Amino acid sequence: MGKVGKRQKKMALRRIVQYTIFLIVFIVLSMFLLLNLIKSEPIVEDNPSSIATNSEDIKSEPTDTSPEFVHNQTRLRKDKCYTFLIVASDQSSGNADTIMVLTFDTVAGKVGIVSIPRDTLINPEDGYSTYPKINSTYLKGIDNLSGAVTNLLGIPIDFFITINTKGFVALIDSIGGIDFDIPVHMSYDDPVQNLYIHFEPGITHLNGEDTLKVCRLRDNNDGTLAYPDYDIGRTRTQQKILITVAKKLLQNPQKINEYIDIFTQYVHTNLSFRNTIWFINPALSLNLEQDISTATLPGDGTVSYKKARYCYELDPEETVKIVNDLISPYITALSIDDMNLFAVE
């Protein structure tokens, strides 16, 4: 083989490795709720299929009878704009501990990520759960949670990615941990779960278990809230951790085999391989500092509904604004009437 042939073969191999790294980083990243998930793809001339495809390869755009169109057949979607539901489960109860909606507008080159507080109030009469908190809908499976999110916010969910927290720990450990600026005093002990969280504000080196502890903390031993704004502060910390992890993943491409093993063992998604590959080109053009916007749905976390305490009642006006600004795939703006924001009267 001549020098030119060897050089071309080497370049092709390098490109395959690069794309594979971006793919793993993307899904691994979504491993706790975030952006790199965008690195999956289908085929350039084909659009990704919807959540109802059960990971089958689709060679054409979803039809107008697919779930994402059934919800609102009269509203037009932006071209090549897709929504993803990212979920991490609660280790003790099986409920969803982290719920995020990520929307990737591949034409505009923008990503919006919105966290839905786990205690967000929902109407039990809607049929997704008898308990009035959205995290409980995950007990019936990812499709049920997806339906609850669509019912709540009025937007379709095209794809899902669920993460096992053991995978998150393994991922952090595979890159040697992270250096993170702990935002608040953390002191919590739960012998039943063998959970002990003790950190002080400032730059701290965290291994996988430590990082998970920081992500999980809500209250301190003395009964005070870890964050003055409760779950808003907690999800803000989670988002910052994910960005930190994403950057370090990209700095360690030589660990690709470990990333693949972790993804295979701990991540579940309905993204087909072809869908995943389609997203690579638009994802490669993203600027992680400028093209990604994050927010947490605002509300009141002190609401009680029947026997459920500390429900998180969403602020209607602010919720509609955030959804329209960051994650709606529709051309025209949604209104409060398009959503199902339950409130205690």
Feature map (PLM): residue ranges:
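Non-catalytic, solvent-exposed segments at the cell envelope interface
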Residues: 2-345
